[in-house]
Amino acid sequence: MIDITLLRKDLDAVLARLSARKNPQPFLDAERFRALEAERRTLQSSTEDLQARRNQLSKQIGHLKAKGGDVAPVMDEVGGIGDTLKAGAERLEQIQGELGLMLMHVPNLPQADVPVGADETANLEVRRWGSPREFDFTVRDHVDLGAPLGLDFETSAKLSGARFSFLKGPAARLHRALAQFMLDVQTQEHGYTECYTPYIVNREVLEGTGQLPKFKEDMFWVSRGGDETQPEQYLISTSEISLTNSVREQVLAADQLPIKLTAHSPCFRSEAGSAGRDTRGLIRQHQFDKVEMVQITTPEQSDAALESMVGHAEAVLQKLGLPYRVLLLSTGDMGFGSAKTYDLEVWVPAQATYREISSCSNCEAFQARRMQTRFKNAQGKNEFVHTLNGSGLAVGRTLVAVLENYQNADGSITVPEILRPYLGGLLELRA
């Protein structure tokens, strides 16, 4: 969440920055916030006055007792003050709770260099790498190319319905090879520590990284035998959730930072609001695999860390020889918790366009504040860390890109040279 002191200092300025995000979207009830803040300040001021009065009366009671005076009236006043303070504390707790809940629905503030715009049309292309291949035969899409290789949507539909996949044989081997290759790049070349995390997490964990409470409809939640008394749990939509929350409620030493973590995991998304979009193939699935990168840094390190993380994702695409472009997302297209986001889009020949394959974001202290994760700075004070996350890469979409960019006229697939050791030296995939 954003720092509430920013809202208290200049609410209008914060609202102006938030208005650059996707509109129309009521992020904050400004009038309710002002009313609660006014009541909070009044309560805190009166509480301080009452506490001072009670201290004064306590001293007076001591003097009266020493002189044998009547303390009953003073004791009655002290008792009344105690009752008033108790009621005030209860109301203050209610106000703080309502303010906290309001903040949970407010997105992060975009950095100053983020392009301002309502949607993806305002995204800024930063660079391109590689040139799309020119084919001398009719290009086939990954569904047609993958079917003889074991990409089986008929079986997955029988098992689970739409937006699932069943891979076997060469397709499954390629999928496994890609994930292992991605992990090797990030751990062996870029210094990430490989992790294996739970795929089911508690509600407060999703609140920490910002999926809840705002985006519950995008999640799959878990019922333990229909027992609704059990703690609320969800399937992860990305291992960013579990990796980032691994440092929740901790105070880290400055020399521990940056922390760099990676994991290969399935991701589960309901795709609410995506009806009719990308219904064919692997592009948009309820369950897909991804290699995730997470960094925990100091505030001074995070801007450079984002640029390096983008490079870590680019390295995978370059080693695979896949053409791509890098976009700086606009204020209207970036995610809820992000202060700045780059998307990597890979060339998909059958669609003759670039499609997202990685998203790398600097969340600054937004998630850390929700998770209560701090580090001890050079002055010995506890300060919120910055968190970053990025895909390195989405495995299914990378499989799509390899099939389509490396296809041959006879339907076989040339194996990218970098993947051959992961596939027992195979040069081609064919039925």
Swiss-Prot record:
Pathway terms, separated by semicolons: Aminoacyl-tRNA biosynthesis; selenocysteinyl-tRNA(Sec) biosynthesis; L-seryl-tRNA(Sec) from L-serine and tRNA(Sec): step 1/1
Domain of life: Bacteria
Record InterPro entries: aa-tRNA-synt_IIb, aa-tRNA-synth_II, aa-tRNA-synth_II/BPL/LPL, Ser-tRNA-ligase_type_1, Ser-tRNA-synth_1_N, SerRS_1_N_sf, SerRS_core, tRNA-bd_arm
Catalysed reactions, semicolon-separated: tRNA(Ser) + L-serine + ATP = L-seryl-tRNA(Ser) + AMP + diphosphate + H(+); tRNA(Sec) + L-serine + ATP = L-seryl-tRNA(Sec) + AMP + diphosphate + H(+)
Binding site for L-serine: 238-240, 292, 391
One GO cellular component term noted in the UniProt record for this chain: cytoplasm
Location of this chain's protein in the cell: Cytoplasm
Record GO biological process: selenocysteine biosynthetic process; seryl-tRNA aminoacylation
Gene Ontology terms, MF aspect: ATP binding; serine-tRNA ligase activity
HAMAP family noted in UniProt: Ser_tRNA_synth_type1
NCBIfam families named in the record: serS
Domain notes for this protein: Consists of two distinct domains, a catalytic core and a N-terminal extension that is involved in tRNA binding.
Subunit-structure text: Homodimer. The tRNA molecule binds across the dimer.
PANTHER family named among the record's database cross-references: SERINE--TRNA LIGASE, SERYL-TRNA SYNTHETASE
Protein name: Serine--tRNA ligase
Organism (species): Leptothrix cholodnii (strain ATCC 51168 / LMG 8142 / SP-6) (Leptothrix discophora (strain SP-6))
